[in-house]
Regions:
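Conserved metal-binding segment of the jelly-roll/cupin
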Residues: 65-85
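Double-stranded beta-helix
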Residues: 34-66
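Short, conserved beta-strand element in jelly-roll/cupin
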Residues: 10-25, 29, 40-53
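Extracytoplasmic/periplasmic copper-protein system
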Residues: 103-115
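His/acidic/aromatic-lined binding-pocket segments of jelly-roll/cupin-type domains
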Residues: 6-7, 14-17, 63-64, 71-72
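A short hydrophobic beta-strand segment most commonly corresponding to one strand
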Residues: 87-105
């Protein structure tokens, strides 16, 4: 049995707003043989804070078929990943910072680059 790949974030809740396309979002379970993001990596410092990526497995893994207009909230610590994307899935990822880890006025460095 092949397990889908995914990631979990130690402290970061994410909200996905599906703006076009769709696929199957896998949540739950646990990350097996995961790789922790390095303390100075972009994943940790810019994107999601400390995270762990690898295969997702376990009896509580749930597959959600999502489509344009769906909104999904993924709590911190919950493994998640994509599978069965037939064409594409575009989504807006919202990552709130209720603990105010980021400095006031923070702008993601990727947003400072021209498109």
């Amino acid at each position: 049995m092949r397990h889908p790949g995914g990631i979990s974030h130690d402290h970061q809740t994410e909200t996905y707003i599906i703006v076009s396309g769709g696929g199957t979002l896998v949540t739950g379970g646990r990350v097996v043989n995961g790789r922790k993001s390095g303390p100075d990596s972009d994943v940790t410092k810019v994107l999601n804070g400390p995270s762990c990526s690898g295969a997702i497995a376990g009896p509580d893994v749930v597959k959600h078929v999502v489509k344009t207009g769906d909104v999904i909230i993924i709590p911190a610590g919950v493994p998640h990943g994509w599978t069965d994307i037939t064409d594409h899935v575009d989504y807006l990822s919202v990552r709130p910072d209720p603990d105010r880890v980021l400095p006031a006025g923070y702008i993601n460095p990727l947003m400072k680059k021209p498109f």
